């Protein structure tokens, strides 16, 4: 085959593949905002992911050091992305770093995934900035390790109500294993992702009811597992907290279809290996929520929190 013919054939094949992927992307009945998509190392791969899973917009969770790269991604695909900012709260300049990024276009703080107590002076300084600038702060709350040697993140969740009460002007978004394990009043200590029926009266359920400044991010295996383990409970939970729940994926698959490495460093989450977390969680929500509740969770609540234009 001549080089010109080869190149022409390659271009046509690539276009056909893109068209096939676009056609196979699910239609969720309206725009969908993924509030938990980490900025990736390769340009435009975040856009590839949201296209593949039928998501229209996403919040790019971005470390302070990568703000310029996130801005480039946003400018390349206008109308699809906004960005967050995260920095180690124990840094002496943490408050200034956050203020600089937020005043330069970041719309939220997070995700905060550090080995600190939720009710610590370092975290208090972050909460103060979030309240000062009117942005949400996303917390990764995990006690059980995903791999040998991993240490807990954002400890002290059983007393988190004290933080919510002490910082009423700060909007918190809870996420991750221990946050979602506490959807039930019966929380095991030997694993991060409990299964089986949910016992009413869980701490997370109670905090969402009691504190207007707490929201819940349904991303990752933790959120998907909590939604899937007891569907009768979930139906009522979604209605009860329809204004406090936001969809997110925290998905690492390459294409919005499950390709690439997913859950590679988290053996306990193997149930979602080879799958797109966004697709899986949206499917559960579509099955269990009414159209109005589905729209609130997948768009309205998150768009309001993260200042995403309609």
Each model region followed by its residue ranges:
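H/E-rich (His + Asp/Glu) clusters that bind or coordinate divalent metals
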Residues: 13, 22-24, 41-44, 179-310
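Hydrophobic faces of well-ordered beta-strands that scaffold small-molecule active sites
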Residues: 33-37, 58-60, 83-85, 109-110, ...
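Active-site gating/metal-coordination segments in enzymes
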Residues: 64-155, 215, 220, 310
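N-terminal carbohydrate-binding/catalytic regions of secreted carbohydrate-active enzymes
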Residues: 45-73
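N-terminal export signals
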Residues: 2-24
